[in-house]
Amino acid sequence: MRLRNGKKIEEDVVVIFDVETTGLVPKRKEYRGAKTELQSKSYYYDVPLPDFPYITQLCFVIYDLATDRVLYLYSNYVKLPEGIDISKEASEKTGITREICEEKGVPIVDALIAFYRAVHRASRIIAHNYEFDHTVISIEMKRNMKDARFRRSCPNADRILTSDYLYSRNIRTFCTMRAFTNICKIFYAGKTSGAYKWPRLEEVHHFLFGYKPENLHDAEVDVMTCLKCYLYLFSPPAPPMLG
């Protein structure tokens, strides 16, 4: 048990999260501009803010490792601003359309507030390709700082996922994609030697459990699959008894 801002927190509570978006972040080589304050700590530092994708679906689970149970599951589509479309590739991959976001989605501010509160309950936050997911959420936090309710509910939201902020609150991060790279040992297509590629979530699951899960690229499915792989890494099944 530790204290954070006078409140007790559990060492064993983790948050696993995933987002679906309107598209991919453009390649960095397409940009030559100087870093902005927001982008200075991001892997995607030289991509202009307006070119980042918008979140179409956010899911996270708060999980207690000590009791092996889900404490809270959040999963929602997110409404998009006027004039923002979902790329054909993203829609085909996820099955999410602008109509789905409009009919079933929640305001982005509501989703961000829920995520902000979840992070502050955790001792570790986890994602598959953490760099992408945390960058997209950080961008959305920055975009919505003009909303008064958001600012009141989420102090420092625009830097909540920066390494300095997380370190100051003893919150660690974990990327299953990076963690499993040297475990899965998958070479790039056509290669039989050299560096291993970063494994996709379905590749990690197949490596561990012998089959690929269905309906990936739904944020909720991705989160539960990521959680399953993470738990395997730290608590692998016991070997069968002999004799």
Predicted feature descriptions by range:
Residues 18, 36-43, 89-93, 192-193:
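Generic detector of short, locally flexible boundary/turn motifs and exposed helical patches
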Residues 2-13, 52-98, 116-243:
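Metal-dependent phosphoesterase core characteristic of DEDDh/y 3'-5' exonuclease domains
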